[in-house]
Amino acid sequence: MAIEKSADHSTVETVHADSADVAADPRAKSALVSDNVFEHQQTVRQVIFGHPVLIWWSFFFSVSAIGWGFDAQVNGAVLSIPSFRRDFGEQYDGGFVVPAPWLSAFNSISSVGQFFGGFLCSTIADRVGRRLALAVGVAITCGGIFGELFSTARAAFLISKLILGVGLGFYLTIGPLYSSEASYVQYHDLRIMSLTRSQQVSPVVLRGITTAGVNLGIVIGQLLSNAAIRGFGERGDKWAYRGPFAIQFFFVAFLAIGLPFSIESPWYLVRRNKIDEARTALQRLYGADTNIETKLVAIQMTVAQDLAAKESKWSDAVRGTNRVRTLISCGVFVCQHLVGIIFVLGFSSYFFQLAGLPTERSFDLGVGVTACGVVGTIISWTIVNRLGRRIIFNSGMAILSTINLLIGILDVVPTRGASWTQAALTVVWAFFYQVSIGAVAFVLLGETSSPSLRAKTTAVATATQAVFGIVMNIVLPYMVNPDEGNMQGKVGFVFGGLGVIATVLCYLYIPDLKGRTFEEIDLMFDIRVPPRKMGGYVIEH
């Protein structure tokens, strides 16, 4: 590795050695420090306008998250379409309902497919690259969508949802992973998997904003889904539900057309020891004005550290102080389910109809719920670094639990216009959810997890979220379906009560790590500072 001083911010290295050799070179460590200092000095404006190619390809791969959000929302929203209930349901009390067992299966099978699709994707991505792995995911997703469109029996529709879920598992893994790897320290994007790398090296001032943005792609997909339901749902034929399914082909086509022109992840190329190809990829992503060699050294250094970190065991995540860190990382996503995320966002339109609102109005309110979610997500970017993580998350839990209880009370003590009031409270719930725990959960995951165990902790958090999602999707149909529990608004008592318990635990365990470096966070956990006191703890340097 030849090294010489540049006239700008850092040292220039011409890299030819493999990652292990670079990691052992003290000059490489100096280059890494120099590059890190420069990154911390950059502003958001400089990042966005200085690297348009990088921003574009990060956005391109992140379209997969919008596709995931669309499917996640359409799963529950399609139940509000009368023709879907007619074709896949049974007659009940003068109408049609999908039996609760099948309803549970339809809603949960996609999560099962995503669980296995994620593991399959990671294996393929490490062997053949991120671009080809996403291409495989696009092909599988395409097959699942075709199955949804032309299924006429419940079993066939269920299998199609499973296949589609596997493809979406690829989306959940590759899209965010590519975005975080390609941008590496400057721009990070959607979904939990991206936190493994982007949180570890992102500037402190941007860390909260970038990870809070994890919700944006998802809620945009949810908004588009409800808009499609609104546009097609009142048709009397099969295209009332086939139309929203067919719109998913847009995301498939967008990715399929752009993939041949996309740039392979430089992180993958370095891991495969394809240094020259990695250099070319970095040059295309960052442009001629960026010190590419320094970034290449930084990637090689991190890859070498990752290889050393493989010696850690899964059991380390629940040992010593890591136990609390892992519980917090997973607990923030459990809280989302305990306050009713699946019920409010997944079953909102169906719930509105069960509450007695006209079909057309239920579709309008479904769009309103997700539109408020988009606004809430954007607002969260402006407050996450001003108010801090703890106050936003805990206040959100308290507000959401209260709203759930109010929805339940309105069902027990019916008043004139109670149905509309419940619907309005649901819209308000969606707004406060996205402003608070919807966005901040991803920030807390990246900040509280131990750097040496971040990949493992992230995997555990992802699995925990998936398991709770499957459970809720199985249980909820039995709670709300007219031929089963028919609880209607009384479901608010269930999630309100669970939310109150979770809020108490959040008061004890949710930390505020705003503005803290990872070294400071490690120190506070190591000396066992109570999480609720970390925000005001003074560290003597």
PLM segments and residue spans:
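Short, well-structured alpha-helical segments
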Residues: 292-304
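Alpha-helical transmembrane bundle of multi-pass membrane proteins
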Residues: 2-287, 304-541
